[in-house]
């Protein structure tokens, strides 16, 4: 089991980051809310990971702290929620915002996330609220919504295409992802900025 990585960021291609540890490159899938806080390529990062084994793949999911990882592990225990959907949920809102939405039973906020219908949102609220009772000491407590900010990477010529590709990887349909990016696109924006603003606008 790989629970933590400390190494140099080689490449950032949202929502994937390549981290080199001891000469080995680990490809890690990260929620965008965690991805935004990563340092730039060439710098050292510490990522808490959860290892998922499937018939066709072995995947690493990464987080900035143990609390975010704990929430991810609880999410994938929910009926109908796999790692991909859990990643999309924690990309659309921060871990703290998700906890707040569940505690306040905000179905409307959850259904705006990709892959979440009303029934899934209601099931998440029922199941997760019950689990939070025993997790608050190790997870989060209801609080004001947090807005994550971090320095954006310099804009690239294909920033919009990268943003669309990342949104598709998170579960949005290609046409929907293109529409989301085109609504907030501007020439000087990096792909990370476009993704963050597109997800924020969707909520």
Swiss-Prot record:
<keyword id="KW-0234">DNA repair</keyword>
<comment type="subunit">
    <text>Homotetramer. Forms an RuvA(8)-RuvB(12)-Holliday junction (HJ) complex. HJ DNA is sandwiched between 2 RuvA tetramers; dsDNA enters through RuvA and exits via RuvB. An RuvB hexamer assembles on each DNA strand where it exits the tetramer. Each RuvB hexamer is contacted by two RuvA subunits (via domain III) on 2 adjacent RuvB subunits; this complex drives branch migration. In the full resolvosome a probable DNA-RuvA(4)-RuvB(12)-RuvC(2) complex forms which resolves the HJ.</text>
</comment>
<keyword id="KW-0233">DNA recombination</keyword>
<feature type="region of interest" description="Domain III">
    <location>
        <begin position="155"/>
        <end position="203"/>
    </location>
</feature>
<dbReference type="InterPro" id="IPR003583">
    <property type="entry name" value="Hlx-hairpin-Hlx_DNA-bd_motif"/>
</dbReference>
<dbReference type="InterPro" id="IPR012340">
    <property type="entry name" value="NA-bd_OB-fold"/>
</dbReference>
<dbReference type="InterPro" id="IPR036267">
    <property type="entry name" value="RuvA_C_sf"/>
</dbReference>
<dbReference type="InterPro" id="IPR013849">
    <property type="entry name" value="DNA_helicase_Holl-junc_RuvA_I"/>
</dbReference>
<dbReference type="GO" id="GO:0006281">
    <property type="term" value="P:DNA repair"/>
</dbReference>
<dbReference type="InterPro" id="IPR000085">
    <property type="entry name" value="RuvA"/>
</dbReference>
<dbReference type="Pfam" id="PF01330">
    <property type="entry name" value="RuvA_N"/>
</dbReference>
<protein>
    <recommendedName>
        <fullName>Holliday junction branch migration complex subunit RuvA</fullName>
    </recommendedName>
</protein>
<dbReference type="GO" id="GO:0005737">
    <property type="term" value="C:cytoplasm"/>
</dbReference>
<dbReference type="GO" id="GO:0005524">
    <property type="term" value="F:ATP binding"/>
</dbReference>
<comment type="function">
    <text>The RuvA-RuvB-RuvC complex processes Holliday junction (HJ) DNA during genetic recombination and DNA repair, while the RuvA-RuvB complex plays an important role in the rescue of blocked DNA replication forks via replication fork reversal (RFR). RuvA specifically binds to HJ cruciform DNA, conferring on it an open structure. The RuvB hexamer acts as an ATP-dependent pump, pulling dsDNA into and through the RuvAB complex. HJ branch migration allows RuvC to scan DNA until it finds its consensus sequence, where it cleaves and resolves the cruciform DNA.</text>
</comment>
<dbReference type="InterPro" id="IPR010994">
    <property type="entry name" value="RuvA_2-like"/>
</dbReference>
<dbReference type="GO" id="GO:0009378">
    <property type="term" value="F:four-way junction helicase activity"/>
</dbReference>
<dbReference type="GO" id="GO:0006310">
    <property type="term" value="P:DNA recombination"/>
</dbReference>
<dbReference type="GO" id="GO:0009432">
    <property type="term" value="P:SOS response"/>
</dbReference>
<dbReference type="GO" id="GO:0000400">
    <property type="term" value="F:four-way junction DNA binding"/>
</dbReference>
<dbReference type="Pfam" id="PF14520">
    <property type="entry name" value="HHH_5"/>
</dbReference>
<keyword id="KW-0742">SOS response</keyword>
<feature type="region of interest" description="Domain I">
    <location>
        <begin position="1"/>
        <end position="64"/>
    </location>
</feature>
<dbReference type="Pfam" id="PF07499">
    <property type="entry name" value="RuvA_C"/>
</dbReference>
<dbReference type="GO" id="GO:0048476">
    <property type="term" value="C:Holliday junction resolvase complex"/>
</dbReference>
<feature type="region of interest" description="Domain II">
    <location>
        <begin position="65"/>
        <end position="142"/>
    </location>
</feature>
<keyword id="KW-0238">DNA-binding</keyword>
<keyword id="KW-0963">Cytoplasm</keyword>
<comment type="similarity">
    <text>Belongs to the RuvA family.</text>
</comment>
<dbReference type="InterPro" id="IPR011114">
    <property type="entry name" value="RuvA_C"/>
</dbReference>
<dbReference type="GO" id="GO:0009379">
    <property type="term" value="C:Holliday junction helicase complex"/>
</dbReference>
<keyword id="KW-0227">DNA damage</keyword>
<feature type="region of interest" description="Flexible linker">
    <location>
        <begin position="143"/>
        <end position="154"/>
    </location>
</feature>
